Amino acid sequence: MFRGSIPPLPTPFRRGRLDEEALRRLVERVVQGGSHGVSVGGTTGEPGTQTLEERKRAIEVVLDQVAGRVPVIPGTGALRLEETLELTRFAKEAGAQGAMVIVPYYVKPNQEGLYRYFAEVARAVPDFPLLIYNIPGRAGVEIAPKTVGRLRRDFPNIVGLKHSSKDLEYLSHLFLEAGRDFLVFCGLESLTLPMMSLGAVGTIAATANWLPKEVALLCEKALAGDYQGARELHFYLLEANEAIFWDTNPIPLKTVLSWMGLLEKEWRPPLGPTTPEVEERLRRMAERYGLLPKEKEAA
């Protein structure tokens, strides 16, 4: 179903509005770079700063540009269940191949509350594949492996989970509860290979917006059992993977993409530009990976 590298696209803005032309450029970069899917509206896309209509339009643009070449898995989660249901239904009707639903943030629900929340979403789109998005650092709560296993048994359309945490022990318990065929994706760039060695089927890594070919190849080698080749790519990508988090994601990502001419260096409040010191580190990193146009390297 879903596997490999599925880059989470940033949302490009121009003068405060969705920059559809830039979004199409980003889609082409990752698809032509060999990515195995595309995600829009995840953490990297700043969904919490957008209206539902803006999020819907971004999904439409990405689906139109992808044109069926690879699966599109939008992030459709929101704090309010009603908004999550509306956006998930929209993604399905628009032609997406699945949706990624974040663990509700800020309110810190208990495990029964999380079960009921995801059960409502699964019931609303019974034949539509769903990935749970586990990101405790942002959500303030983690969905337990036992809760995921219960959801998987009760709702066949809950097919996988994106794990954005350094806790690798979690994965072992998750596979025991949800089954070895549960589709787990790494959500922390530098842990792609370690998670895939435990059974994850791919990564949803922001680094793939910079280096789509290399991230896709790492996943392909790991899935084929070529761990020596995958390790070489793991260490090659390490600095870029770490650079994503030199400031709050997607600030470093968008900074470098703006230098590459792919989007404007623009965020929605409360996000803002990084420090000159981080910019200089990013510039040196981007030079080492050959990401900058020649005039930028000389600047």
Curated annotation (Swiss-Prot):
An annotated Gene Ontology molecular function: 4-hydroxy-tetrahydrodipicolinate synthase activity
Subcellular location: Cytoplasm
Principal place of residence: cytoplasm
GO cellular component, one term: cytoplasm
SMART domains named in the record: DHDPS (SM01130)
Pathway(s) per entry: Amino-acid biosynthesis; L-lysine biosynthesis via DAP pathway; (S)-tetrahydrodipicolinate from L-aspartate: step 3/4
Binding site for pyruvate: 44, 204
Entry keyword Disulfide bond: no
Tree of life domain: Bacteria
Site feature: Part of a proton relay during catalysis: 43, 106
Task performed by this protein: Catalyzes the condensation of (S)-aspartate-beta-semialdehyde [(S)-ASA] and pyruvate to 4-hydroxy-tetrahydrodipicolinate (HTPA).
Protein name: 4-hydroxy-tetrahydrodipicolinate synthase
Biological source species: Thermus thermophilus (strain ATCC BAA-163 / DSM 7039 / HB27)
